[in-house]
């Protein structure tokens, strides 16, 4: 017997639904174009704390490996700290950052706004949660259709219709479980490991490493021409990286 599935990380911009996917040559390669997503997770059990630690690639609405901005981490460094950048609807530039306690700052004035982002990356105005309309998908008249379905869900900076949006690049998120996967903490984004002007590395999906000889955890990731190992010696509280070039050409 099996229990009901538990999602360690989940977005609600699109309905959780079963879709009959056509198998004909014309439609079988159709792709949903507007959803935020998680992909390529990797998991390990930390013997020191007993926690299960899961990392995954995070993609904003409509973004994947092929179209992610490779020259932007999505973060801004201020006084040695990295803060998530946001662009407001109607703006051409990313003029806002998410600072301590989730307060959204206007970078032009360096002053707080009336907006905040909570630990789920949802947007609030004056402490009140904002919403967007959820999407559903179906096939109609020989094409894939993505349509609003009338259900309001909390606005999230990774969503297509959010008032504030993150940079269209790839990120890495981490979540932990204290009960071997029965329930999970809210995910948090890891800081950039390759600087402000480089997108995040991509996780090698599957399993991380917990070394027997120490409390070290290691997750393998990759970027163009390079392997980058994410390392934690404190049960995932902090991370550092160690990179190695790939000894052959045309590798990603």
For each predicted feature, which ranges?
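Asp-box/BNR beta-propeller blade signature and adjacent active/binding-site loops
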Residues: 1-252
């Amino acid at each position: 017997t099996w229990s009901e599935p538990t999602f360690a990380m989940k977005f609600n911009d699109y309905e959780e639904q079963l879709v009959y996917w056509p198998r004909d040559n014309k439609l079988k390669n159709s792709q949903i174009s507007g959803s935020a997503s998680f992909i390529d997770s990797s998991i390990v059990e930390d013997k020191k704390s007993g926690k299960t630690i899961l990392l995954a690639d995070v993609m904003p609405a409509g973004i994947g490996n092929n179209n992610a901005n490779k020259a932007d981490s999505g973060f801004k460094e201020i006084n040695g700290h990295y803060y998530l950048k946001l662009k407001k609807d109607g703006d051409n530039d990313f003029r806002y950052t998410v600072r301590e306690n989730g307060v959204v700052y206007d970078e032009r004035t360096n002053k707080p706004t009336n907006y905040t982002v909570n630990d789920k990356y949802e947007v609030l105005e004056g402490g009140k949660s904002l919403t967007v309309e959820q999407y559903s998908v179906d096939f109609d008249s020989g094409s894939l259709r993505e349509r609003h379905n009338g259900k309001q869900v909390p606005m999230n900076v990774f969503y297509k219709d959010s008032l504030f949006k993150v940079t269209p690049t790839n990120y890495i998120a981490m979540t932990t479980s204290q009960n071997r996967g029965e329930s999970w903490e809210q995910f948090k984004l890891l800081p950039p490991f390759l600087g402000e002007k480089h997108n995040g590395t991509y996780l090698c999906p599957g399993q991380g490493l917990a070394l027997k000889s120490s409390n070290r955890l290691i997750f393998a990731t990759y970027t163009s021409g390079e392997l980058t190992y994410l390392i934690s010696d404190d049960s995932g509280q902090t991370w550092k990286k160690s990179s190695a070039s790939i000894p052959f050409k045309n590798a990603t």
